[in-house]
Amino acid sequence: MAYLLKNQTYKAKMMTKSNTKKSDKDLWATPWWVFHYAEKYFSIKFDLDACAMQHNTKVKKFISPEQDTLTADWQGRYCWMNPPYSNPLPFVLRAIQQSVLHNKTVVMLLNVDGSTKWFDMCVRNAKEIVYITNSRIPFINNETGEETDQNNKPQMLVLFEPKAPYGSLKSSYVSLHTMKEQGLNTK
């Protein structure tokens, strides 16, 4: 049974200082090798990118900011999501909802921040969390299209699956080097 309660809402606080321009704050894209690693590790072929734009989507079907993934119908069974990091809580709640109520498998790429309510929601509802160690993901700058080393937090992959038994969370760890090596060697 999922921990998500009907109509449950929270207010999230932004507590991390960043040098990123406010206009670009939530526009950093996932490197392809991270996406490919997630597909390989979880044995999933994603068919929906739930938080993307035309120029950075990882699959053909995607939900743009204008379409609003928090309200849009998710037309996919295996969903990838790298949500805006300024306020991930509503996206975590939406991923849990889609998994529990609509039989979707969702993998989220999130910061590691054990002090937040959304992290607690992940721990309570996810089937697996993969912590990325040894370095931080060099996200793709929205303006330049290049990987950047300006990331100031570690990341994790969070797997939500339908009918995952409550309290069955598995924690795993992968070094960024291994992740990149395996992600680049797919196909």
How would you describe each model-predicted region?
Residues 2-187:
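Class I S-adenosyl-L-methionine-dependent methyltransferase catalytic core
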